Amino acid sequence: MSMEPPVGLTAMPVTKLAMITTLVVPLVASIASYKHIFLLQYDPFLQTYHQYYRLLIFQFCAINESDTVILALIWYLFRHLERLLGSHKYLTLIVLSWAYTTLGIWGLNLIWNAFIGQYKWLQWNNFSTGSLPIVLSLVHFYKEYTPQIYEWNIRLLGPRGGASSHNDNKREDKSAVEWKINDQFLLNGLILLLILNQGFAGILCGFISWMCGIFIDKGLLPGLDHWRIPFVSYFISQGPPTRANVAIAANAATNTAAARATVEAATAATGNGNTGNSGPTSLPLRGSSTTPTNTSSAGDDEPGADEPARPLGVQFLDTFRR
């Protein structure tokens, strides 16, 4: 399997759904002036008003527009995971991450405020907005199962004097700062920006969610190995085949060893039927000549004498290539 995923989201229905949800829900909520229902705080929404439904929906909409754009880019980079796990398992992983991160953040929030948050200045009041918990849970899977393709080094040197000598060069080499950066640098930068945009709540919720991802992968939080979301296989399928998909599938089938073996067997059967003296006459392959060829007199000088009969699909493609 190639390390580089295909361009676009044609074969990535779950990634497409996640990106559309991340972009459309904040837009519709902003137009309808309902963005405030996705804001989650311990006081007053949970402690005073007991609006626990906010725990179920606070990850579906980012309050800040910058977080919305960053989350959409991160979902696009996560298409590696959908290609690796498959659409159905990837969707199950997202749902499990949503459930476990919500329960984990809420439970630790209650414990924190029950013992430490009695003092107002130590109370954990704000939660993260948007799908930051789900994304931080999936970061573990991305780091664990996505190989690094390339890396490069960046050296930062101090200011150089007017006259440099050999000793000065040695001193500069010792004082140089070298950074090693790999191809996951873009994802790391986006994750860092997303966490810093949300302050202390982003750091705390992000760490809890990252730990939830580790526990899901190690099997401490069950569900990923033995359970799949029911009744969604039809909706996450690729849909009706397009002209490009049919052409790619036909070309791949022609190039397989099984297809070549079938063509050779059919060619051999046709040759035996033409040279035999008894028995029924075998029908020629489509595209081959019905006139028997005298191979003994033709010899090897005739071009295409040893060329096997071409299937109909190959002839059809050759017609348009000419």
Curated annotation (Swiss-Prot):
Residues 41-54, 112-120, 211-322 are cytoplasmic. One of its GO terms (biological process) is ubiquitin-dependent protein catabolic process. GO terms for cellular component: Dsc E3 ubiquitin ligase complex; endoplasmic reticulum; Golgi membrane. The keyword Manganese does not apply. Signal peptide: none annotated. InterPro entries: Rhomboid-like_sf (IPR035952). Residues 269-322 are annotated as: Disordered. Keywords: Membrane, Transmembrane, Transmembrane helix. Residues 1-19, 76-90, 142-189 are extracellular. Component of the DSC E3 ubiquitin ligase complexes that tags proteins present in Golgi, endosome and vacuole membranes and function in protein homeostasis under non-stress conditions and support a role in protein quality control. Component of the DSC E3 ligase complexes composed of at least TUL1, DSC2, DSC3, UBX3, CDC48 as well as VLD1 for the vacuole-localized complex or GLD1 for the Golgi/endosome-localized complex. This is DSC E3 ubiquitin ligase complex subunit 2. It comes from Saccharomyces cerevisiae (strain ATCC 204508 / S288c).
